[in-house]
Amino acid sequence: MRIAVISVPAQRREVPGYVKSLAKGMESMGHRVDIIDAWTEDGFRLPGYEYIAVCAEAASLWGGKMPLALPKILAFGSGLVGKKSAAFLKKTSPLFINKALANLMKAMEKEGMIVNWSEIVLGASHAEALGKRIGA
């Protein structure tokens, strides 16, 4: 299965280690995985994937806001209606983590994506274990 892993860190920086671990877990199950950085790339390639996994961090500790790059990349990826997807949120703080995950799923569903799996990622090893469960 062709899977796109969209990396949406809270601030513009390189792809975090937990996103690479998630992709590594998916690849170990035989999937073809591409990591897309939401801060530097556009979403024009997204409709070509069978499954889309969004890995995000909350932009603020209070209120669970999502980074500005998330709605931008999802809006550019036209043709996402009905696309199966997963929402992964990196736990950065014990406060408002559920609200941040709900905001992530709301942004994805706004573009018509079907979120059939959501999870809070605790670290790189946890992300790799989650990646092995996709498509199983």
What does each model-found stretch correspond to?
Residues 2-136:
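FMN-binding flavodoxin-like domain, especially the glycine-rich phosphate-binding loop
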